[in-house]
Amino acid sequence: VNEINRKQIGRIGLSMAINYFTCQGYTVSLPLNDTQWYDLIIEKDGILKTVQCKATQTESGEISLRNTGGTKGAVYDNIINHSELDFLFCVNKNLDMWCIPVKDILKAGNRNRIVLQNTPTVNNQGFQTYKYQVQILDKA
C-alpha cells in the first residue's frame, strides 16, 4: 500500500468491517455522524451489536485503544470507557482482520493498546489477539 494518511487508514478499517459483517449475514448500519463511541451497528436475528473499527499501518501491529482527533491529535476518549461496546474490529497493514469482543479486552486488563498477532506470543504472555483473527469466509 502506498503512503496513506490517518483518515484513509480509518476508512480502510471501516470498509473492511462493513465487508466482513455483510459477508457474515449481518445488516450493517452506519451512524449519521461521528460523535458516538461506535462506528457501526450490526444486526442479525433481531440482535443489535455495536462495533468500533481500528486500523494500523505500523510494523508492530499496535492498536491504540484511545481515540484521538482534532488538529493536534489530542486523546478524547478510550474504548475501555464504553463497556457497552460489543466488538473491536481491527485491520493491520496486510489487511488481516480481527474481531475482538470488548469484554475480553476489559477482562485482560488492557487499558491503552493491544498488538495484533497471527500466532501466540512467546510463553503465551499478554493478550492473545491471534485467537480473534477472522477471514471473510468464516462462518459467524
Regions found by a protein language model. Give the residues of each.
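Mixed-charge (Asp/Glu-Lys/Arg
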Residues: 1-36, 41-140
